Amino acid sequence: QARAMEAAGATIIDSGGESTRPGAPDVNLDEELERVVPVVEALRAQSDIVISIDTSKAPVMREALAVGGDLINDVRALQEPGCREVVAEYGVPVCLMHMQGQPRTMQANPHYEDLFTDIENFFTQQIAACEAAGISRDKILLDPGFGFGKTLQHNYQLLNELERFHRFNMPLLVGMSRKSMIGNLTGQPVDKRLAGSLAVATVAA
């Protein structure tokens, strides 16, 4: 599937072994390693495409980077033990995502005192922690976490004022493709959300 995506024009492949969709169960370390590391190793042997590792576990980060991973994409923003140290050691880029709660419960009742202030404070704290661990500021990307502990209103408020995060002077990763925020607005099932995905991506850009 990764090779087909590259042939279709993909420039980055995101490889993960644990679903982070709302309500998703946890995956143990051994199983995640078995799901991720062989795939990264095989893909690297056949391609120079950028490989992003979607994980929140330091051992998975370490082993996947050792066999050819290029970037860490962490929905928990390197807050789990040992993660910052691994990223600092390998000197790779990292995407820090904001998520309120955990995947299993994050959509139960999302609430913010002030949406942007809360997320900006989170990013400020995590950027400082990364720099203290030896991660260069120019290696950090930020993801406001559309659909991760956010109501429909929160998601579209973020989209409408996304430029507020420009103050960090860091690249923004915006992941909205086929998400429920599109389906809830358009009434379309997952396989019919391409037009909506393109529309919100255009607004974000």
For each feature predicted by the language model, list its residue ranges.
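Active-site-adjacent loop and "lid" segments of alpha/beta metabolic enzymes
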Residues: 1, 20-48, 55-59, 65-66, ...
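Catalytic domains of carbohydrate-active enzymes, especially glycoside hydrolases
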Residues: 1-16
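Phosphate/pyrophosphate-binding loops at sites that engage ATP/ADP/AMP, CoA/4′-phosphopantetheine
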Residues: 7, 11, 126-139
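Short, conserved beta-strand segments within well-ordered enzyme catalytic domains
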Residues: 14, 50-52
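Conserved Motif II region of HX4D acyltransferases
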Residues: 145
